[in-house]
Amino acid sequence: MSRFSGALQLTDLDDFITPSQECIKPVTIDKTKSKTGAKITVEADGYYEESESGKQKLQKVEITLQDCLACSGCITSAEGVLITQQSQEELLKVLRENQTLKASGDNEQVRTIVFTISVQPLLSLAHRYDLSLEEAGRHLAGYLQQLGADYVLCTKIADDLALLECRQEFVERFRNNAELSMLSSSCPGWVCYAEKTHGNFILPHIATTRSPQQIMGVLVKQLLAEKLGVSGSRIYHVTIMPCYDKKLEASREDFYSEVSSSRDVDCVITAIEVEQMLQAEEQTLQQFEPKDLHWPWTDQQPESMLWAHESTMSGGYAEHIFKYAAKELFNEDTPTELQFRALRNRDFSEICLEKEGKVLLKFAIANGFRNIQNLVQKLKRGKGPGYQFVEVMACPSGCINGGAQVRPTTGQHVRQLTQQLEELYKQLPRSNPDNTHTKQIYADFFDGTHTDKSAQLLHTSYHAVEKLNTALNIKW
């Protein structure tokens, strides 16, 4: 029996907001001068008419996914909007339709299906099915090709390009304005939070370099399309990522390509969704014939498709940029293994480059919203700790502990699982983004480094979301 009176009891108390009639976004109505006597008729099927001297059908009010992304009404639960557009069900539907078109010989309508796999969800699936990372990658490639994939790619080339662009952006910013802290941009949960909560104050701090997912989208829809001799709109590009926020990122208007007349990434699924797809078929990853991942970018393939970037599990931005900046800006060499010093908790750490008692560089890694909020508040108060660069990730422990990674199956604590995934990650060979593959991509596709084309396709912009001052967002 409830110990609260009926008048005081609250129900459905949670922070998850799904699309419904309770959407708080006010609809803009274009008003025109009307004469007396106009009449609006609403029929049983929802048809609207305005009659005066004749009839005119009124426009239907629509709230789109883009409205939800551009609305300040909710932050943490916009993923609910994407249930139909960014789901395993939609993916399987597209794959079935494509197989039917192939069988009918309707080649003009057949789409080239491309999957891109990020290393973090692959680690999660490798642990789940007790496989090495290489084995998991090859079995997953076999599974996806059986579903209908034409190409199964890794994110290595995009990871490398993101590091190269971000480090150059930092050096340029440092030389122009050393006082402005630069914050990483690869985490869409963090970017969405910054746009909706802190707006124009924090956005100038965020790097403009696109995330590896969106760089991969450009390469698939433009470079791969060019190599295949097809339009980018005839490619259906799916990414497998460690968190649901990547679905939001793929849906941003900034990542709709006028060149290909399509989104750079059409669908995002996650490690946990891959597990659910396998469970629905009562199968495991090991049951599928192993296949090699594809490498369509350069004539010579890399030694391995799966690499680690520095020692951090979220792309290695802070460590790589620190090493590069130390050499480029101050001609200082750094150790191969950098030692970040943990501060109040293991999710906030820093490193300094000092010479003759003077701090030349001060970088940090901030994972989890508690640390992000503390960092932003210090910047707002003008009491920032003097970091020139901060690698920011919304999830505690970073991308390896993304919200859509496979859950522990034996009552294991998430922290213990994360540590095991970190150990798997450390077994991977280290990637140096300065390699023959990135140099060839820059030369052949981007017309060189630091060009207008590379700036357009490898960078993006951010948009402060205006706060909605409306009583519609108050629920009593």
From Swiss-Prot:
- Which terms are listed as keywords in the entry? 4Fe-4S, Iron, Iron-sulfur, Metal-binding
Pfam families linked: Fe_hyd_lg_C (PF02906), Fe_hyd_SSU (PF02256)
Which Gene Ontology BP terms does the record give? iron-sulfur cluster assembly
Q: Where is the signal peptide?
A: none
* Keyword DNA-binding in record: no
Which InterPro entries did the record assign?
Cytosolic_Fe-S_CAF, Fe_hydrogenase, Fe_hydrogenase_lsu_C, Fe_hydrogenase_ssu
Q: Where does [4Fe-4S] cluster 1 bind?
A: 23, 68, 71, 74
Could you state a single Gene Ontology molecular function term?
metal ion binding
Q: Where does [4Fe-4S] cluster 2 bind?
A: 187, 243, 395, 399
Quick check: keyword Cell membrane in the entry? no
Q: What does the sequence similarity comment in the record state about its family?
A: Belongs to the NARF family.
Free-text function comment from the UniProt entry: Component of the cytosolic iron-sulfur (Fe/S) protein assembly machinery. Required for maturation of extramitochondrial Fe/S proteins.
Protein name in UniProt: Probable cytosolic Fe-S cluster assembly factor GH10760
